[in-house]
Amino acid sequence: SSPHLVQVRERIRINGQPISKDLFSKYFWLVYNRLEKTRDPAHASMPAYFRFLTIMAFHVFLQEKVDLAVVEVGIGGTYDCTNIIRSPVVCGVSSLGIDHTSILGDTMEKIAWQKGGIFKPGVPAFTVAQPERPLEVLRERAQELKCPLYLCPELDDFEEGCRALELGLAGAHQRSNAALALQLARMWLQRRGCQGVGELKEVPPGTELLGRPVPLAPPFQLTDAMIQGLRDTEWLGRTQVLCHGPVTWYLDGAHTTSSIQACVRWFRQAALNQDKPHDGSEVRVLLFNATGDRDTAALLKLLVPCHFDYAVFCPNFTEVSVTNNADQQNFNVTLENSLTRCLENQRTWTRLLEEKVGQDPWLPSPLRAGGLLQPAPTRGSLLLVPPAPRPLNSPALVFPCLAQALRWVAQGRDPQLAAPAASGAHPHPAASSGAVLLREAAAVRVLVTGSLHLVGGVLRLLDPALSQ
């Protein structure tokens, strides 16, 4: 799977656990040296990062003699380097969203065409409820590639006559993921000749059922192992809650409009479920970053209704200086470029709040908090300085790295984080006034969302054991 959150070993798992450091090192050098020896002089470059890890993953699975390999596509499907398996047991397409538009296209239909490229002749494929036209594109791709395509039944259909299924992953959107997982698992068990899961009888492509152009796969009787699997599933960085004293961290990597909408629904419900402080003093903080060609304005607009007291923007770097932690390094971007993107996000947040106030005169003005920082050109380092006074600031702050951002948010109240320096790199008055509120609040609720790399950096700082 990809991306990893803390350590690259997370991408290659056996029996649910990342392979050990020794095993990773062993197979890394074995694959690297073999590629080096067989390199074609006409094509001297080694495979890129993701492609190399894909080759390595296949080699690990073959050498370790796994019974089943679950392979997640990197980007799209048709032209992805994972799409070299000629006869998989089954294929699955989860809920579609707009992402990686420069590679996959800027419409759901174009993206659906790319996703459908993983379909194989005679190999059953499943998908979940999709918008009408993208679903039609998937059906057309299935017919083109002679692949029997089925629509997963709703999870509710599995619950008839039994108690409601409990999912380990929170959020309503996880129900469709669970329904897809059940169908994929059933096909594997059916291939193995396991009894008690029912047999999926192939429906001719194009058959309509309940007005749908894609046939609906029937629900089946779930085994105890399936029910337990759904209940015990964990996936770091997705709808994850960490309670550290008065500071509660809500982590959910989401970088498309549909995933941000799901994140907002989950966060609002999760915050409601938490015990309310007796004196009512609660501070809500957003920690956000997005990378690539994503429309951050569209993403941030969806987060405004959460009524955050502060919005914090920072790059995905855990520290300002380059560390020796290769798992967290991205050599394709610089701190300066990343920080410029954060400043753009902050200005967007300011504009969105001002528009919100303009639309509703009863809303309080965002004058009471703010702090816009701009990079000052220096030699060898990056400094942050406050700009000239502006008539209207936003309740937003920009930090140069995650460590500084998290220390400011926690204000020494999270045992995993050191207290912020008395004279830090954030001299704006809003940082000082916000620090007082954060220190005195009975509860601090922090939503960390956007880039999965951001979530991974936060996890590394909040749970050092993940780096071991």
PLM ranges: what are they?
Residues A44-S45, A125-V128, Y250-L251, V285-L287:
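Short catalytic-loop micro-motif centered on adjacent basic/acidic residues
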Residues P153-E159, F317:
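Beta-strand-loop-alpha "switch" segments that mediate conformational coupling across diverse proteins
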Residues G74-C147, R265-W266, L287, T291-L300:
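Conserved catalytic-core segment of NTP-binding enzymes
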Residues R86-S87, H244-T248, H255-Q468:
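ATP-dependent carboxylate-amine ligase
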Residues L68-V71, C81-G92, L96-G97, C162-Y310:
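Nucleotide phosphate-binding/pyrophosphate-handling subdomain across enzymes
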Residues S2-R86, S102-D106, E132-L135:
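ATP-dependent carboxylate-amine ligase catalytic core
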Residues M56-L62, L182-Q190, R460:
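Short glycine/serine- and small hydrophobic-enriched flexible loop segments
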Residues P148-C152, Q240, Y250, L397:
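General small-molecule cofactor/ligand-binding pocket signal
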